[in-house]
């Protein structure tokens, strides 16, 4: 009787493992700006964000929206296309974007606005460098930036 029970459990586990997973490959052919993805984050609205060597990409489950460096200084945008890291702020509706040599960007995804933080040699409170490689949320609602 014990052998039958063990056999039944084994068969049940095999059947439960046979459930198919749906995997979707996303790349430049689907609208991603570059296949070299350096960071991925999910915001509070459920959107996926991809940091690449050629811009910031927002995926809504169907299509990509790409945010590139804005050369027109009268409009808002990210300060560089070569990105290092992403962090969805645990408190606010802000996506933090670390760039290579172009500072730290804060994207408010509710109001669709960007803020930029750069190194300023005249301001000791500014970033120590414009190359932001990692952003981590601290327990006290501050950010650790390297």
Please place each PLM-identified region on the residue numbering.
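Carboxylate-rich, polar loop motifs that coordinate divalent cations or form catalytic acidic clusters
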Residues: 1-146
């Amino acid at each position: 009787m014990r052998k039958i029970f063990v056999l039944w459990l084994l068969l049940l586990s095999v059947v439960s493992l046979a459930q198919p997973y749906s995997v979707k490959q996303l790349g430049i052919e689907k609208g991603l700006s570059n296949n070299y993805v350096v960071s991925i984050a999910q915001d509070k609205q459920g959107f996926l964000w991809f940091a690449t060597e050629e811009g910031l990409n927002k995926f809504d489950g169907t299509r990509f929206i790409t945010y590139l460096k804005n050369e027109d200084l009268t409009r808002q945008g990210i300060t560089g296309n070569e990105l290092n890291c992403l962090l969805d702020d645990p408190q606010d509706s802000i996506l933090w974007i670390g760039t290579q040599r172009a500072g730290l960007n804060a994207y408010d995804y509710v109001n669709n606005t960007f803020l930029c933080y750069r190194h300023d040699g005249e301001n000791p409170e500014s970033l120590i460098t414009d190359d932001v490689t990692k952003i981590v949320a601290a327990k006290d609602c501050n950010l650790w930036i390297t």
